[in-house]
């Protein structure tokens, strides 16, 4: 008898959930997309409009589109061994914008960052994924963008970057160069750059 009462309660709860999910589709889609997006290499969501990650695959692009992303920016080289073949066509075929800025691993340049920032500033509220191979380049660009343009706390942005990696000497110097060009210091209370 107890089982007979439990089944209708479960059924009622399930029907309520289904009716709410159909009325508010984001209830179920958001849970599924977030789980799916977390499967992308080193995926970090900084806010509702901006995320970074490592290399995506074709399935990831479809999940990103379903999750409401409008723009994909790729900042590594189109190496056939590591990059997604025809990523530009795949992204655009899904109705998203695609930008490619090949940033040299051993020689990132201020103009690379400025190009990225210019793309972001055209439509800052366009949901964007910035990615490279493993989210090393992208996490540095994200740190810089968040500090310079979003005026976020440097220590907080640095902690997010260090969830992925501690930048090596080349990338630390790049960070310092970019910050200096925007008249900002890399020094903060909780910032140890060693």
Feature annotation, model-predicted:
Residues 136-140:
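Glycine-rich nucleophile elbow surrounding the catalytic serine of serine-hydrolase chemistry
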Residues 5, 22-23, 118:
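Intrinsic disorder/low-complexity segments
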Residues 3-15:
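Bacterial N-terminal signal peptides that target proteins for export
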Residues 131:
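Short, surface-exposed ligand- or partner-binding patches at beta-edge/loop junctions that are enriched
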Residues 14-23:
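Bacterial N-terminal signal peptides
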Residues 26-128, 141-194:
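Cys-dependent protein tyrosine phosphatase-like superfamily
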């Amino acid at each position: 008898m107890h089982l007979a009462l439990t089944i209708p309660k479960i059924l009622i709860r399930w029907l309520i959930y289904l009716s709410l999910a159909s009325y508010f589709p984001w209830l179920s889609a958001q849970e599924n997309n977030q789980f799916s997006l977390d499967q992308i290499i080193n995926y970090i969501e900084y806010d509702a409009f901006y995320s970074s990650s490592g290399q995506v695959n074709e399935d990831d692009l479809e999940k990103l589109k379903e999750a409401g992303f409008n723009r994909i920016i790729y900042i590594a080289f189109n190496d056939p061994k590591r990059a997604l073949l025809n990523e530009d066509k795949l992204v655009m075929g899904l109705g998203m914008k695609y930008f490619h800025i090949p940033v040299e691993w051993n020689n990132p340049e201020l103009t690379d960052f400025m190009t990225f920032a210019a793309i972001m500033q055209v439509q800052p509220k366009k949901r964007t994924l910035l990615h490279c191979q493993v989210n090393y380049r992208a996490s540095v660009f994200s740190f810089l963008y968040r500090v310079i343009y979003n005026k976020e706390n440097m220590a907080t942005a640095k902690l997010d970057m260090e969830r992925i990696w501690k930048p090596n000497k080349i990338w630390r110097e790049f960070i310092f160069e970019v910050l200096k060009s925007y008249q900002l210091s890399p020094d903060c209370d909780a910032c140890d750059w060693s």
